[in-house]
């Protein structure tokens, strides 16, 4: 299964959170399960993603929510309209 973000065209692939062309980004990847109509993203914060010891920086959480929800919406819309994720947007 290929991550939804990997279907994004190059001009959309620079996002700090999920852009595969952003060398310094987080490279968040979301996976769609068409049978369940659900998506999943897994991400393990690194020690340098902390706000204070033991707590993840809020900006990282916002990036996770943003990138995961955008990819999920794209996959859900594609499925609802019977489109392939591989089709050009």
Could you say what each language-model-derived stretch is?
Residues 1-89:
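Terminal targeting signals and extreme-terminal segments of soluble enzymes
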């Amino acid at each position: 299964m290929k991550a939804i973000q990997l279907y994004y065209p190059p001009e959309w692939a620079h996002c700090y959170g999920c852009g595969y062309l952003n060398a310094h980004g987080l490279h968040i990847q979301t996976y769609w399960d068409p049978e369940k109509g659900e998506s999943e993203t897994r991400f393990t914060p690194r020690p340098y993603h902390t706000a204070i010891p033991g707590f993840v920086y809020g900006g990282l959480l916002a990036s996770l929510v943003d990138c995961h929800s955008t990819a999920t919406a794209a996959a859900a819309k594609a499925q609802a309209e019977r489109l392939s994720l591989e089709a050009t947007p």
